[in-house]
């Protein structure tokens, strides 16, 4: 108990020294909130006496009493909890006697305090943001569903149109083939000695679209007229003017005529032979002609005439290469 008494008396002396120092310090400044220096000294002394009675249980903070551009006033003696400061929240409302005065100041940590209205507006805005996002997502889903349904309807309509066009074209192809079969009957031409049958015309199948159907009928009628004009009285077909003037067609015609003449000669040599017999005969003839050419070259040369009997017996000793070198 004696130690506690000594400690309380020591604290009382410290409080009195701080109170005297603060009275001297604050007396030199003007009070911005309308308070006088006498009032502040009175409050400080009252605060000091109250603290000395509580045995140091309530400490006077130096930060709240320092002059930082706003009013530093002490609470009344009747209230016990207004002197405590929070470490995170600094208020800017202070009671001077029975009157209250609001002083605009920044926080001790350097952060500015926002009014309650702006805090409420920000809270409402943050609450409304998810609602707006939900509405936008629902609108986008509805729009995508509408577009997908439109695309499906368009695809179905295009498929139906394609099927209808295919059905029409198939019907027209069937009709054209029937007309060609009717027109492709056998035609007979009379000769001086008798009648000769001509080959029936093959049915022509043509597919045309809706726009080309009208022009196709006229084109077929023109072709029938040209074919009828090309038929001669003797039954021989004559080439049209365009084919007659083409040089490739003339060359092909002459080549066919030559081949036919040679085949007739071979048929006379082998009257009852087939195509295989004629081909083998031609190969043997070619080999015999080559043998004769070799014999003539060997016998006509002064250096190689002695090899003629060896080549005659069918031995290949590379004489063909030597003969080619000599001729060069």
Curated annotation (Swiss-Prot):
It is found in: Nucleus. This is Transcription factor bHLH84. InterPro entries: bHLH_dom, HLH_DNA-bd_sf, IND-like. SMART domains: HLH. The gene is BHLH84. Residues 220-229 have a biased composition (Basic and acidic residues). GO terms for cellular component: nucleus. It comes from the Eukaryota. PROSITE patterns: BHLH (PS50888). Residues 243-292 form the bHLH domain. Belongs to the bHLH protein family.
């Amino acid at each position: 108990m004696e130690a506690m008494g000594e400690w309380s008396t020591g604290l009382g002396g410290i409080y009195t020294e701080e109170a005297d120092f603060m009275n001297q310090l604050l007396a030199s400044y003007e009070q911005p909130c309308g308070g006088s220096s006498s009032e502040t000294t009175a409050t400080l002394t009252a605060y000091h006496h109250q603290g000395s009675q509580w045995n140091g249980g309530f400490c006077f903070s130096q930060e709240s009493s320092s002059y930082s551009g706003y009013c530093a006033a002490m609470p009344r003696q009747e209230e016990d909890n207004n002197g405590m400061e929070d470490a995170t929240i600094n208020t800017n409302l202070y009671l001077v006697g029975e009157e209250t005065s609001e002083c605009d100041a920044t926080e001790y940590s350097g952060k500015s305090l926002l009014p309650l209205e702006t805090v409420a507006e920000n809270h409402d805005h943050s609450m409304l943001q998810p609602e707006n996002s939900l509405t936008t997502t629902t609108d986008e889903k509805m729009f995508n569903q509408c577009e997908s349904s439109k695309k499906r309807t368009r695809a179905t309509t295009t498929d139906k149109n394609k099927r209808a066009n295919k059905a029409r074209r198939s019907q027209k192809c069937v009709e054209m083939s029937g007309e060609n079969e009717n027109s492709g009957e056998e035609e007979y031409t009379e000769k001086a000695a008798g009648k000769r049958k001509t080959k029936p015309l093959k049915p022509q199948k043509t597919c045309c679209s809706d726009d080309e159907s009208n022009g196709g009928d006229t084109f077929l009628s023109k072709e029938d007229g040209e074919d009828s004009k090309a038929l001669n009285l003797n039954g021989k077909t004559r080439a049209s003017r365009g084919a007659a003037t083409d040089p490739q067609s003339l060359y092909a015609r002459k080549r066919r005529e030559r081949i036919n003449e040679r085949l007739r000669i071979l048929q006379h040599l082998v009257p009852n032979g087939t195509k295989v017999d004629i081909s083998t005969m031609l190969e043997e003839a070619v080999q015999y002609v080559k043998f004769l050419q070799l014999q003539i070259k060997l016998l006509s040369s002064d250096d190689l005439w002695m090899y003629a009997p060896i080549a005659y017996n069918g031995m290949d000793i590379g004489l063909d290469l030597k003969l080619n070198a000599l001729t060069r």
